[in-house]
Amino acid sequence: MAKRQVQKETRSQPHFLQFNNLACETAGGKVIFATDEWFAPARNLLKRDPPEFIASAFTEFGKWMDGWETRRKRIPGHDWCIVQLGVPGIIHGFDVDTSFFTGNYAPFASIQATCLDQMPSIALEGDRTGMAASPSQFEAVAQLNSDSWKEVVPVTKLKAGYSDTCHNYLSVSYPHRVTHIRFNIYPDGGIARLKVYGIGKKDWSSVFGQDLVDLVALVNGGVCVGFSDAHYGHPRNMIGLGMAENMGDGWETARRLDRPRVLKEDENGILQVPGSEWAIFRLGHPGIISKIELDTNHFKGNFPDSCRIEACSLTEDEENSFIQSQWSSDRSPMWNILLPPQKMKAHHRHVFSGPSLVHCGPVSHVRMVIAPDGGISRLRIWGRPVSSHQMISKL
């Protein structure tokens, strides 16, 4: 039977969980070094799917675990690994997930961070279960001087991997771009997942005046800042890399319960329904939008009937105020129609440009509104970034 998420639980979760997981394997994150991977390899830390437990699963090295688990340490020191973020950016928080590690979780952890100008050539290949770092690997990683990286999370006591204690949320206040983190566990043990929540930070200095850029993309600093419903998939999935792998890699809402018993359509073939769902994104850089892509890939029996896109320009203070009010309708921004309501198709890539779009000038935020409900796998907002001077003149 499904477990209902109560409102109290939702409110107690930190806000940074709405941001993007910059280290997820689907975003290009990878573990480039680990001191020890005897029971389970460190690459498992970055899996997108939730951890699982199979009671009967064993390997020749011991109990199979869906995470990173080191051997019981019998030499001086502690275990650690280095994660290369798939999307460099500003980190706002971590989820150190100990799911299913109940008698074997790492009791303490700390995290360090840095921004490297060049990506190191260090890499871990293949299944490393039952292995430890070799002397040559230790020698290579020593060149990174990771022990002197900035400590963004001090040594922190972790909780066991039971359902009510497994998520160890760690907020961060570090306003600098990060490319790599060093994840330290003390002295040894297991961690199921490590999620690095933040916002991508792109160098826009060389982009102005060039080709169109996907202003909302995860890699370009786009971020979801509000939504009405995320029952089956978070809206942030829509700005991920490449095409969606499946429905779970997109945004899907629950079925609205206010749907009419008998559905009717207007002269344009769009269903007349009282309700809708929405998701709001801050663009990675303000810009003038000239093309929009809406992809319902994989959504065949559950795509929205229609979709529209709205846009506006907000200051940081205005955005924070609206987030605090959860974008309530009585304090909503002045949204302008960018893309009028469009009839959607199943499992289809919809592209809109030219006369299909309404010129709104430079904008910083977009709102997708779907009716009555359903799922979309990808959102692309193509445009040309504008300077801060152009935005100020508009405001």
Swiss-Prot record:
Q: Work out whether the entry's keyword set contains Secreted.
A: no
Q: What is its EC number?
A: 3.5.3.4
What is a GO molecular function of this protein? Answer: allantoicase activity
Keyword annotations for this protein, in alphabetical order, are: Hydrolase, Purine metabolism
User: Highest taxon of the source?
Assistant: Eukaryota
Q: Hey, which pathway is this one from? A: Nitrogen metabolism; (S)-allantoin degradation; (S)-ureidoglycolate from allantoate (aminidohydrolase route): step 1/1
Answer yes or no on keyword Membrane. Answer: no
**Gene3D superfamilies in alphabetical order:** Galactose-binding domain-like
Belongs to which family? Answer: Belongs to the allantoicase family.
Q: What protein does this entry describe?
A: Allantoicase
What is the organism of origin for this protein?
Danio rerio
